[in-house]
Amino acid sequence: MTPERFRSITSRYAGLRIAIVGDFCLDRYLEIDPARCETSIETGLPVHNVVRVRAQPGGAGTILNNLVALRVGRIVPVSFCGDDGEGYELRRELARLPGVELDHFVTSPERRTFTYCKPLIVEPDRQPVELNRLDSKNWTPTPPALAQRLPATAGARRRSSAGMRGRCVV
């Protein structure tokens, strides 16, 4: 592929509208400074002091992040999160991204937001080292009423997108 052909293709990304249907989660990174390690008075176990916390959309949100990086014009996540602090944080991070429309991203009190907490040992001039991950998941099936809302939402989005350039990723 020539550079001109590549630019010709990628220059059209801004005109696309893409829906992403899938499991969105919150990836939360806890950056730990090993120089600040202490010992717990109560338990005698090591205490890993977190010096920075950052979060970003994960799961299907990783695909969304990639589309944002490619400067796709409009991106519509079709999914849900819990009505909890992690859901608030996930929605906030999605809303910060250019071109992301949250009209079809449902908040539900019946579910908790999938959250993957990733402790990282961070030292100067070294790659971060990930410790054991801490996951918060739903261990029961998605309630049928909530599951039924998502296909209806995606169908409404497809009908309202008639005649527009773009694809629905399912």
Indicate residue ranges for each PLM-predicted region.
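Ribokinase/PfkB-type carbohydrate-kinase core domain
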Residues: 1-38, 42, 49-170
